[in-house]
Amino acid sequence: AHGRIQGHYMDGQLDRSSVPGKNLTLGIDIDLQMLGERLLQHKIGAIVAIEPATGEILCMVSSPTFDPHLMIGRQRGKNHRLLQMDKRKPLLNRAIMGAYPPGSTFKTAQALTFLQEEIIHEDYPTFPCAHGFNHKGLHVGCHGHGSPLSLIPAIATSCNSYFCWGLYRMFGDKKYGSPQNAITVWKDHMVSQGFGYRLGTDLPGEQRGLIPNAKFYDKPYRGSWNGLTVISISIGQGEILATPLQIANLGATIANRGHFITPHIVKEIEDNELDSIYRNPRYPTIDREYYEMVVKGMRAAVDGSTGSATCRMAGAILPGVEVCGKTGTAQNRGKDHSVFMGFAPMDNPKIAIAVYVENGGFGATYGVPIGAMMMDQYLHGKLSPENEIRAEEFSNRVILYGDEER
């Protein structure tokens, strides 16, 4: 035990010869992993990158981390207790265990659901945005941009009002018979896209997140609720929770135009085939044609082709690469979380990524530049000289988290 010979158990009656294990090859890109850990220094959050074509996890960063040498030697018990007591929770693998509001990255999944259910189409209807969604005394704020909007500019500008209207129309559509029936259809689409349940990655401890169903709302509201009651879920807030792995997987699904392979760390097992779940594609309940519309919106968020562009910085960091992206600014009791989901290049994509920086503010503040630098490293094998300077600056940025329990 712990490297010390203790003698034979039951005089060796149960002893068995050791069986050598199989050699494993991981899909982790060591340079990408090192860059991610560097960029998240002095911050709390996670980065997950996936190769869309294979589902291989290219990097999985959780910050803060800890020195594994603390877990050996005579002080290992004491060290483990100290790590458990640390308010920053370094033992928590936030990439698969952190359940966060996905914020506006979730609007892409909403768009696909509304398209599939024929609540919206690419060019119509257009929805108004007077600095937010306003209906029957309810206001959900939004930033300034053109109005009214159709789907692609709504994704590019991350318009809250557009997606509030979409959810309100779906949950009030008479074809479903009731909001309860509508949310059941809605949830089934979300689950098929990888939310609400564990994806089944080959690491222990994965959390499922949360996609609410009709019963979730029927109990507190005694069955009397509608789209306005739950409007915040339209923009990835309210009761919606997702892991960074699930958000990255959504990016990979969109990059593939409608399928994903369960994300996995192990690339190869010596003399063995990977389990079929890590080889065979899974198909959401969304028709392939609708993914192209969301791709256009995510591309417009970077290149500004529809006017305002929430991910414009990604284009500046990766000139010449057709990056597709979606920011998220997830509301929180303290400062908002900074989120980014994207993939590159637009056609024949090589990498899909999710970045989540707790209390980092707007998605463009931390999520977008970190995500773009990670894509630069992977696509080109190294950072450009300009991005190397930028990476050093970001690695030295410190987010102060105070003394609150985390």
Please provide the spans of the model-predicted regions.
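Beta-lactam-recognizing serine transpeptidase/beta-lactamase-like catalytic domain environment
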Residues: 4, 11-13, 53-105, 109-363, ...
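Conserved, well-ordered alpha-helix/loop/beta-strand core segments that scaffold catalytic motifs
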Residues: 7-46, 50-53
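Charged catalytic carboxylate motif
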Residues: 31, 35, 185, 293, ...
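Short intrinsically disordered coil segments
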Residues: 40-43, 76-78, 370, 388-389
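A general alpha-helical scaffold signature found inside nucleotide-binding enzyme cores
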Residues: 181, 366-373
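Short, gly/Ser/Thr-rich active-site loops of penicillin-recognizing serine hydrolases
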Residues: 275-282, 370-406
